C-alpha cells in the first residue's frame, strides 16, 4: 500500500506517521480521486504517483526548513491543497491559510479539511493580487507556492503577504534556478533577498526539485501587488 511506502520514506527523515495520520492520507487520496472526476484538481491520479509526486513532494519542504514551531502559513494557489495540507497533517501546529481564485477548489478544500478533522485551516476565495492588498498583508511567517507561475510572477503575488523577517518558499521543478536569475530584480524591489536554493531528488527517479527560500528584509512598497493579471503580463524584470 502506498501509505506504507510513505510511512517508510518519511521515517528515514525522522518523521513517524501515527495511525491517525496514515488514515488522513488515505482519506485525502480517496477524496482527491472522487472529486477529480467532477472537476480538474490534478492530472496525477494513480495511487502511488499521488503519494510520491503530491504527498511526499509536499512534505519534503520540511526536510530543509523547521516547521515544528507554531507558524502561520499562507499557500497561494494551492489547487488541491499542495503543499500545505500534507504539511498540516504532519505538523498540526501550523496555522494554514489557502488562497485560490477558483471557488470550486475552495469548496473541495473545505470538505477535505472537515473529513480530515483539521483545525486552524482557512480557505479564501480570492486573487492573490487582491488578498495581498488587504488586512492580511505582511502577516504570515511563511508564504509558499508550488507550480503556480514563474518565480518573477510569484514573487509579486507572495512577498507582500510575508511579514518582515518571514520567508517566501517557492517550490519549483529543476528549472527553478533559471527562473531565479530572471526574478532577482523583482525580489529586491519587493523587499526580499534570496536566502538559499536547495536542490533535491524525489525517490524512484521521479525528478529533481528546487526549493527557493527568500527572506523578507523590508516592507513591500504599497503599489505592489499590482492589479489582478498585471504581474503575469508584465513581471518585474530588470530593464
UniProtKB/Swiss-Prot annotation:
Keyword list, A-Z:
Cytoplasm, Methyltransferase, rRNA processing, S-adenosyl-L-methionine, Transferase
Q: Where is the protein found, in the record's own terms?
A: Cytoplasm
Chain residues that bind S-adenosyl-L-methionine: 77, 82, 128-129, 146
Q: What class of enzyme is it?
A: transferase
Q: Which InterPro entries match?
A: rRNA_ssu_MeTfrase_G (IPR003682), SAM-dependent_MTases_sf (IPR029063)
Region Disordered, annotated ranges: 215-239
What is one Pfam family matched by this protein?
A: GidB
Question: Which residue spans traverse the membrane?
Answer: none
What Gene Ontology terms describe what this protein does at the molecular function level?
A: rRNA (guanine-N7-)-methyltransferase activity
Which EC number(s) does the record attach to this protein? 2.1.1.-
The function of this protein is: Specifically methylates the N7 position of guanine in position 535 of 16S rRNA.
Question: What does the sequence similarity comment in the record state about its family?
Answer: Belongs to the methyltransferase superfamily. RNA methyltransferase RsmG family.
- Put simply, this protein is called Ribosomal RNA small subunit methyltransferase G
Q: Which organism is it from?
A: Staphylococcus saprophyticus subsp. saprophyticus (strain ATCC 15305 / DSM 20229 / NCIMB 8711 / NCTC 7292 / S-41)
Give the lineage: Bacteria, Bacillati, Bacillota, Bacilli, Bacillales
